Design a protein with these regions (language model features):
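A polyanion-binding, active-site-adjacent surface
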Residues: 1-157, 165-168, 191-194
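Short, glycine/charged-enriched secondary-structure capping and boundary segments
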Residues: 43-46, 103-105, 173-177, 199-201
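Solvent-exposed amphipathic alpha-helical surface segments
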Residues: 61-65, 173, 213
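Short, conserved loop/helix-junction motifs that constitute active-site signature segments
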Residues: 150-155, 173-179
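Intrinsically disordered, charged low-complexity linkers and terminal tails
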Residues: 154, 208, 212-216
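Short, flexible loop segments at boundaries between secondary-structure elements
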Residues: 175-211
């Protein structure tokens, strides 16, 4: 079943995939759940409202563009910005986990697969499921995610999994490195959460670590 799920993911990836953007000089990499509509449009992780929240908080200024678009445009321009050069962005899954991002025909052709995606996306507290197919889907997603982490293995860097889904998969991953500093418990930046009072201490810690490692 794992092989069948991977085949579906690879087929959907031909039309709906958003790849990581990790400059060779990246020393601070953010890990999110998956792309959505704006990410597909711009072919960059965190290219929507969540990305705007990230950019405004991290750069300590109001910005018009989301972090994903800033990092992508900097890469396309030949890496002129020394700060953006050191930021990597990736998703656990290169394809969206929400079926709203897909054409209706593709959803109808893979209804069972999309039902599993929705269930695994909303049950972040679990690592083992009573439904065998959900365990198979988790294994398939983890295999793909491990490929992303292999790209930065051997680097000295800080990894920031944002939100419970990303944190769960970082913990499940067998790809590790003693040179990595992993900052857990950072919320997903959706719904302007990084500016909410209840996350103030964690976001202050994130900004402090970011400035110590990135701003040049």
């Amino acid at each position: 079943m794992v092989e069948k799920i991977i085949a579906i993911i690879e087929q959907l990836s031909k039309k709906y995939s958003v790849k990581p953007i990790i400059p060779d000089t990246a020393s601070f990499s953010f890990i999110l759940e998956s792309p959505h509509i704006q990410e597909l449009k711009h072919s960059a992780p965190v290219a929507g409202s969540s990305g705007k929240t990230m950019a405004s908080v991290l750069l300590d200024q109001t910005v018009e563009k989301p972090l994903g678009l800033l990092v992508k445009e900097n890469a396309e321009a030949g890496f002129p910005d020394r700060t953006l050069n050191r930021i990597g962005i990736m998703n656990v899954s290169n394809i969206p986990l929400q079926k709203k991002a897909y054409d209706l025909l593709d959803v109808k052709q893979n209804e069972f697969f999309f039902d599993l995606l929705e269930k695994i996306r909303t049950t972040n507290e679990r690592t083992v499921y009573s439904i065998p197919e959900m365990n198979d889907l988790q294994t398939a997603l983890l295999q793909k995610f491990n490929e992303h982490l292999m790209q930065i293995r051997g680097r000295t860097c800080t990894l920031v999994p944002c939100g419970r889904f990303a944190q769960k998969f970082v913990r499940l991953s067998t790809v590790t490195d003693d040179n990595w500093n992993i900052m857990y418990d950072v919320p997903h930046p959706s719904y302007n959460s990084w500016n909410q009072t209840r996350y103030r201490d964690k976001i202050s810690e994130l900004k402090r670590t970011f400035f110590e490692n990135i701003i040049v």
